Amino acid sequence: MIEAQVGKRYAEAIYGIAEANNKVKELYDSLNIVMELYKGDKEFKNLVDHPLVKKEEKKEFINKVFSEFEKFSLDILCYLVEKNRLSYIRGVVAEYLKIYYTKNRIVDVEATFAIEPSEKQKAKLIEKLEKKTGKKVNLVIKINKAIIAGGIIKIGDEIIDGSVRRQLDTVARG
């Protein structure tokens, strides 16, 4: 609960600063990289979260690890360290993404199929989904052989289940 509140407050402030400096996309990309590292690297997560590691050490580490980032992104990360909020990075990034997606009219769509669709099929699906939603689609494909054939599309809270598995289950229930 606290992480979500802190994340929202900081994400809104950071987005506003990024927007004023015309750095919204750059910061979006940087925060995604930081988030992936935070989720996937235990040492990084431990360093960020550990209360006994001094702020200056954390800032030095961030500047070294993310040296390819532009100064603006590094300054934002160091600001989060200074305010003892880097450990809330998941909430900050999640909220920043929500703001970014809303303002840029982007929607995440998860599509699950029994087999990997071709690039042509993916392009056609994206085109149809963009027409349906009126937004740019960020498509994530998942493979699950248990659905037999067809597909399951998840757009936010809406699920469109056109799988053969669901149809068979419906027939079996009678």
Curated annotation (Swiss-Prot):
Family, similarity comment: Belongs to the ATPase delta chain family.
Record has Transport as a keyword: yes
Keyword Cell membrane: yes
UniProt-listed SUPFAM superfamilies: N-terminal domain of the delta subunit of the F1F0-ATP synthase (SSF47928)
Source lineage: Bacteria, Fusobacteriati, Fusobacteriota, Fusobacteriia, Fusobacteriales
Domain of life: Bacteria
Residues passing through the membrane, by range: none
GO (cellular component) term, any one: plasma membrane
Protein name (database record): ATP synthase subunit delta, sodium ion specific
Keywords: ATP synthesis, Cell inner membrane, Cell membrane, CF(1), Hydrogen ion transport, Ion transport, Membrane, Sodium, Sodium transport, Transport
Classification via PANTHER family: ATP SYNTHASE DELTA CHAIN
GO-annotated biological processes: sodium ion transport
Gene: atpH
